[in-house]
């Protein structure tokens, strides 16, 4: 039965239809931009009102739905099929939503091609609870800095912190920035000069040395703008892409082809799967171009996070916006150096890099000359 009865005559289809109605009504009432806040308890109250149930009845109904979904998954597993159940997925989502209705979450409705309801946790220490219950833990990464912020985020008690210099030769990595461009919204969209200079920098830097290069954008929208304007065709190289929503298998195919193509170019997003999860040893990646600072796009979610961090830590913008951007940039730059023999250059196309602690970038009057000098070209 593809539409099993789960509680008091209600079927799965009834619950799905209910959720569609609630989502549609939430969009009509609260949505004014890409995503917007809905009141805490909104979803639970709507379910109670529309179904005529108490909170206990809602929970019992969802537990019954969960059991029905588990039965579907178990049957598929028995038949050696992928144990996937959309019934189970929906039940898990609704149960998780009900259980997290509290002070450290905000609740959002989103529109667009993929409308959704989202419960977003503002406090990282909630997810770190298993660590906090241990006698002691060790957290180690090249991108944890600033350590005092990491300690605050996770709510660690009486920590011992230590920061060590990189064991790799410092002369193997050069990081620089330019002063005449920025991806700040009013500059990027206030006229064509800044955008055209960004394009020219990317074209000139890719063309100045025949090295495998990654161009990291602060957003998919800016990357798509470069693509739509024909920049890949101006580079004279094979160009590969990390695109929004790309299946993992397709992304891995792109990465294999990129790594096998000497001097190829990769378009990716700072903070995406490539910049934070893949290694490029040896000559697989030698030049990284960071087009701007990956500050989070203004949104209801981001506003809520800034407000929460300001109230809890007294530094809302730094904690919610600046530090995450720096970590993303450090991750992207870190793709260049994975061993003591790797060498690489990172060029940040944004004057604001000068003010970012933890990036340690030097001013490049002419980044093309700096890159060519680093690799010994004349």
Regions found by a protein language model. Give the residues of each.
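Conserved coupling segment at the C-terminus of the helicase ATP-binding
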Residues: 1-213, 218-233
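Short, well-ordered alpha-helix to beta-strand connector turns
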Residues: 134-135, 236-237, 285
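Short acidic, glycine/serine/threonine-rich loops at helix termini
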Residues: 149-152, 189, 227-229, 278-280, ...
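Short, solvent-exposed amphipathic alpha-helical segments in soluble enzyme
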Residues: 152-156, 230-232, 281-285, 305-306, ...
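Conserved RecA-like helicase motor-core motifs
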Residues: 158-163, 231-253
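Conserved RecA-like P-loop NTPase helicase motor core
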Residues: 179-193, 242-352
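Long, largely alpha-helical accessory region at the distal end of helicase-like NTP-driven motors
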Residues: 214, 221-223, 338-378
